[in-house]
Amino acid sequence: MIYYVAMPFIPKDDGLTPGQGAECPSEIAAIRRAEAMSRHEPNVGAIAFSRTGDPNVGEFEDAVILKAFGVVPDDFGYG
């Protein structure tokens, strides 16, 4: 099963912290949602990513960054 997620980033004193992620029905929906999140204060950026896995056994592959908007942490590098 593939999950698509949009997740914003919020500035904190010690850097950026992830905000509340939103599961989306498709890759395009996740990208559009991330773009919208990146423009909504207090967010300074957002990413859209996908993750493949089996929730019944709790096994998931690493996330694949689909698109990044605005400011995101270096460890969420895109491109």
Which residues make up each language-model segment?
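Short aromatic-glycine-(Arg/Gly/Cys) micro-motifs in beta-strand/loop hairpins
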Residues: 1-19
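Unusually extended, aromatic-enriched hydrophobic runs near protein termini
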Residues: 1-4, 26-27, 44, 78
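A short, charged, amphipathic alpha-helix used as a generic interaction element across diverse proteins
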Residues: 24-45
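Short, mixed-charge low-complexity intrinsically disordered segments
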Residues: 38-79
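Surface-exposed loop/turn and secondary-structure junction residues enriched for glycine/proline
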Residues: 12, 19, 27, 63, ...
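Intrinsically disordered, low-complexity boundary segments flanking structured domains
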Residues: 8-9, 33-36, 52-53
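A generic short-segment signal for beta-strand/edge and adjacent turn/coil regions
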Residues: 14-20, 32-37, 74
